[in-house]
Amino acid sequence: MTIKRKKVSVIGAGFTGATTAFLLAQKELADVVLVDIPQLENPTKGKALDMLEASPVQGFDANIIGTSDYADTADSDVVVITAGIARKPGMSRDDLVATNSKIMKSITRDIAKHSPNAIIVVLTNPVDAMTYSVFKEAGFPKERVIGQSGVLDTARFRTFIAQELNFSVKDITGFVLGGHGDDMVPLVRYSYAGGIPLETLIPKERLEAIVERTRKGGGEIVGLLGNGSAYYAPAASLVEMTEAILKDQRRVLPAIAYLEGEYGYSDLYLGVPVILGGNGIEKIIELELLADEKEALDRSVESVRNVMKVLV
């Protein structure tokens, strides 16, 4: 008898992709197919086998395979894209656009061919533009092509707030809107610690410093690593989104969604609060923004559109 589980394919077997695959398997969310280019097929198979051999120790039942053949990804429920060239110290997100856009288009054609009903979650940077590129190439409904940045950016924001207050991170809630870059918009007014507004707990200048650190969060880790970029928190964020989809949890999460008039913008992907469930993005939630918040979001949108101009 064949065991029928959900199926998730992770494209890109680097640090983020491999970590995502392992976390998905550990949580028994799905069988996992880890995919990379033919030149890296053996290392990809090796990573997958290594993860599988951890299953008796970690106590999880999930099959994991490594491959370079997209036929192995057929009929995936969710496809997570982490592939692309890595961001290096001093490299702007704009520098990544041309190369990663070509990579996205090639990957997307294979996904659409083998898993036409899948939901695609994109991580590859610059993620707002890359998600748009995938959407245009796939021809999927907008609800089924989603970018990941807000969960990660919000996680960083929550981490820094918890450290500042010496509170549990479990009790910190918040939202980060906009593009995944230096112009992202952490919404302090919609952020709480145990239901208490942050503005009543943390002095304004400290909050501003935390907001600024959140904006530079990815760059901070890139600088510390010296080579490569963050992968544990990005992988955990991808898994949270994938779990919400596979289990139809209808989670309220920040995600990169295609806008058609929401917040006053159209024809771009931008980080906004959404309801994430079995159909992908079930609904975009429009928050009322103050004038300064809307101005900040406008700047973020301008940055995203400037990156999109480089799309090939």
UniProtKB/Swiss-Prot annotation:
This is Malate dehydrogenase. CDD domains: LDH-like_MDH. GO terms for molecular function: L-lactate dehydrogenase activity; L-malate dehydrogenase (NAD+) activity. Catalyzes the reversible oxidation of malate to oxaloacetate. InterPro entries: L-lactate/malate_DH (IPR001557), Lactate/malate_DH_C (IPR022383), Lactate/malate_DH_N (IPR001236), Lactate_DH/Glyco_Ohase_4_C (IPR015955), Malate_DH_type3 (IPR011275), NAD(P)-bd_dom_sf (IPR036291). GO terms for biological process: lactate metabolic process; tricarboxylic acid cycle. SUPFAM superfamilies: LDH C-terminal domain-like, NAD(P)-binding Rossmann-fold domains. It is an enzyme of class 1 (oxidoreductase). It comes from the Bacteria. The keyword rRNA processing does not apply. Keywords: NAD, Oxidoreductase, Phosphoprotein, Tricarboxylic acid cycle. The active site is at H180. Its EC number is 1.1.1.37. The gene is mdh. Substrate binds at R87, R93, N125, R156. The modification Phosphoserine is found at S149.
